[in-house]
Regions:
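Active-site glycine- and acidic-residue-rich loops that bind
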Residues: 25, 164-175, 197-207, 269
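Hydrophobic faces of well-ordered beta-strands that scaffold small-molecule active sites
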Residues: 1-12, 44-48, 86-90, 126-130, ...
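A short acidic (Asp/Glu
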Residues: 57-59, 97-99, 141, 173-175, ...
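Active-site acidic/histidine proton-transfer and metal-coordination neighborhood
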Residues: 68-188
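Active-site beta-loop-alpha junctions enriched in small/polar residues
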Residues: 6-10, 51-53, 91-95, 131-135, ...
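Histidine-acidic metal/acid-base catalytic patches
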Residues: 187, 198-292
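Charged helix-capping and loop-helix junction motifs
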Residues: 65-70, 143-147, 175-176, 203-210, ...
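N-terminal pre-domain/capping segments
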Residues: 1-86
Length: 292
């Protein structure tokens, strides 16, 4: 389904994977169930948020003809035949730039196992979305630590990584990520629309769109994360970084070809609602009046 000019595909952030998912089989089966359910509902992009204290998984030693390998093969075939896009989103408690060694090691372990799983289901490209996390009052130093830890991962894992912007001005804008991460280790930027309204890094929304897209490899459709504010003023300026339950406007693209993940509390219901109603929604007016 083509959702208007240059917006090809849409998905939503799924937060229903439990931190107590027991072992590789149940995790793989939950992924298969989710992508199959999304596909049936006309949603060709699946994004799964990895919860805090996620059960350690081990995909490095899956035996042939085991129930795990059968599910993994089913996911591989499904993704290949349907060209379904699969992403994992790691919130900021997975923190490669942390000053606490155990946090860094736990984060690297989760990233490595997800990368192995993605390799097994045939996903070799950008598919793991990271936030940098706390800046400790020193954004540059934190980004340098983050980049060092990225480069300590295996090449296959690094090729799947991307990084996204934050809403707090003390954290990481698209401007920060461009100079501090993309130019250093080449991770593409996943642009988050609502956080940019509160932490623009001196860029207009249009400028941030174009800069984020420019970080993606040629031939790959960038993935962005979109939500609208739960509170706006009379000029349409966002007053709260908390996302609204549904979208009231069409997702802007500025003529750029992108796929979009909706980050909204209503999840699947909100995504289906957008698919059903986007033609009747108003175009979004990007107001020049906004927050720094």
């Amino acid at each position: 389904m083509i959702l208007g000019r240059n917006l090809n595909q849409i998905g939503y952030v799924n937060r229903e994977v439990s931190s107590s998912t027991d072992g590789t089989y149940l995790f793989a089966q939950s992924v298969l169930d989710l992508i199959s359910n999304n596909h049936e509902k006309g949603i060709p992009v699946t994004c799964i948020e990895i919860p805090q204290n996620f059960t350690k998984l081990d995909f490095s030693d899956i035996e042939e003809e085991s129930k795990e390998s059968e599910v993994i093969w089913s996911i591989f075939q499904f993704i290949k035949s349907n060209r379904h896009r699969l992403f994992f989103f790691l919130p900021n408690y997975y923190f490669l730039g942390s000053q606490i060694e155990s946090v860094v090691e736990d984060s690297k372990s989760v990233i490595t196992e997800l990368s192995i799983f993605l390799d097994q289901v045939g996903v070799k490209e950008t598919s793991i979305i990271l936030r940098i996390g706390s800046a400790y009052g020193a954004r540059r130093g934190t980004m340098e630590r983050f980049c060092r830890e990225v480069m300590s991962l295996g090449d296959s894992a690094v090729k799947k990584l991307s990084v996204c912007n934050d809403e707090k001005p003390s954290l990481f804008s698209v401007t920060d990520l461009l100079s501090g991460v993309f130019y250093s280790v080449g991770l593409p930027i996943v642009f988050r629309f609502l956080p940019h309204q509160f932490n623009s890094g001196g860029l207009s929304t249009r400028e941030a769109y174009f800069l984020a897209v420019s970080t993606w490899p040629g031939g790959k459709v960038p993935i962005f994360i979109h939500s609208e504010s739960s509170e706006v003023d009379e000029n349409g300026v966002s007053l709260s970084p908390v996302p609204s339950d549904k979208l009231l406007h069409r997702i802007p693209t500025f003529g750029l070809e992108i796929d979009v993940i909706l980050d909204i509390p209503s999840g699947l219901e909100g995504c289906i609602g957008y698919l059903a109603n986007y033609i009747s929604l108003r175009p979004m007016v990007i107001n020049k009046v906004g927050r720094k």
